[in-house]
Amino acid sequence: MLSEDYPRIEYILIDGASTDGSTEIIRKYKDRFAYWVSEKDNGQAEAINKGLSRAKGEIVAWLNSDDYYLPNTISEVTNVFEENPDIVMVYGDILAVDEHGQTTNILKYKQLSLENLLCFQIIGQPSVFFRRAALEKAGLLDTSYHFLLDHHLWLRIAQQGKILHVPQIWSAARYHAEAKNRAKAAEFGREAFRILDWVKSQPGLMEAGSGVERRARASAHRVDARYLLDGGKSWSALKAWMRALFIHPPTALARMNIFVSAILNVVGLGKLRNIVLRRRQRIVSGNK
């Protein structure tokens, strides 16, 4: 991150009182930071909010410790905002890498609307950038969320104006066995349903979501199914996918891979699925 070519970057570093030597590294580069602190916090959202609340730049983003930007990303993002003064948020694509830095997948997104976000079309956080003015209107992260905290914020920012997808890879996100989105995968669904309940209390979102209510509910079950599958709870994932199918068939059928993977695991053929996935990862990373 410190090697980015764009000259006007405000670096804010929030460390949760790490004991792995991170503080010593931070002190080495402390002159590059507008602000830094190493202290205990009450979770990811609170830590990120500490940084967001101190940001002074017109464009704001955050990175978790496992993730990083690709070269020239900041310059490209700045140009997009300058060329599109009416947008409040922009997002690009993401490289998924393992703990060794090897590419395992390329996460390609599409142009989404507020209605798409209400139906849990998820945008990868590391490649998201937004205007500070929009953040000030939307508010900081809700600290009661731990898994879909970013999606909850995107919904609020998208109410402020246009969002734009740029089909370029801007960041890399590291996935490993200890990552939160795998270790506690079953919690994602609970927060998806919480967001649905929250939407009902937001007049502007209720109006935007009035035509997609069934699809949104089915999508929450689909999200639940996807992360239950990641968490190794295949039978629960299958039941969640079936609930999505009952509520809004097209939403469930668009993710038949969840159904197929869950079935393979339930009948004891999960190893076959894993072989296929490993082969796919080798192809993506260029290792035949």
What are the language-model segments listed below?
Residues 1-8:
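Short, acidic, metal-binding catalytic loop of nucleotide-sugar glycosyltransferases
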Residues 7, 15-24, 64:
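A conserved acidic beta->alpha catalytic loop
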Residues 20-28, 68, 72:
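Acidic helix N-cap motif at the loop->helix transition within catalytic regions
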Residues 25, 39-55, 76:
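Glycine-rich, basic loop-to-helix element that forms the pyrophosphate-binding segment
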Residues 53, 106-195:
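Conserved nucleotide-sugar donor-binding catalytic segment
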Residues 60:
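Short aromatic/hydrophobic "clamp" motif used to bind/position activated sugar donors
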Residues 68, 72-104:
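Conserved donor NDP-sugar-binding/catalytic core segment of glycosyltransferases
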Residues 151-152, 169-288:
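C-terminal subregions of glycosyltransferases and related glycan-biosynthesis enzymes
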